[in-house]
Amino acid sequence: MATVNQLVRKPRAPKVDKTNVPALDACPQKRGVCTRVYTTTPKKPNSALRKVARVRLTNGFEVTSYIGGEGHNLQEHSVILIRGGRVKDLPGVRYHTVRGALDCAGVSERRQGRSKYGAKRPKS
């Protein structure tokens, strides 16, 4: 236990909590411009071509964002919205692209879990 004099000389430092999504600046989403859209391969033991985009955010950060769902319409200079959420088998990918927002179209023909992919309700 510290004495009063010790605390006067050097006060207690507040706890600093580390964030998993530093580029969001404590915001729920951020807007950015795609600088590169490409596919990459996951870690062992998985095998696929995962679609990702390199994004320059409005706050100056440059991050890699995963593009979920089947098919997408993104290309260089597309303006997209990103949210937090890492992809476990892609090292360095800590953000997800929000489908159906800004320049990113929703997943067409999506029937279940539509809200996560920006898909409208089908006409019965």
UniProtKB/Swiss-Prot annotation:
3-methylthioaspartic acid modified-residue sites: D89
Coiled coil: none
Molecular-function GO terms, alphabetical: rRNA binding; structural constituent of ribosome; tRNA binding
InterPro entries, per database record: NA-bd_OB-fold, Ribosomal_uS12, Ribosomal_uS12_bac
Membrane-spanning residues: none
Pfam families: Ribosom_S12_S23
Keyword presence, Ribonucleoprotein: yes
Annotated Gene Ontology cellular component terms: small ribosomal subunit
GO BP annotations, alphabetical order: translation
Keywords assigned: Methylation, Ribonucleoprotein, Ribosomal protein, RNA-binding, rRNA-binding, tRNA-binding
Subunit description: Part of the 30S ribosomal subunit. Contacts proteins S8 and S17. May interact with IF1 in the 30S initiation complex.
Similarity remark: Belongs to the universal ribosomal protein uS12 family.
PANTHER family for the chain: 30S RIBOSOMAL PROTEIN S12 FAMILY MEMBER
Functional note: With S4 and S5 plays an important role in translational accuracy.
Name of the molecule in the record: Small ribosomal subunit protein uS12
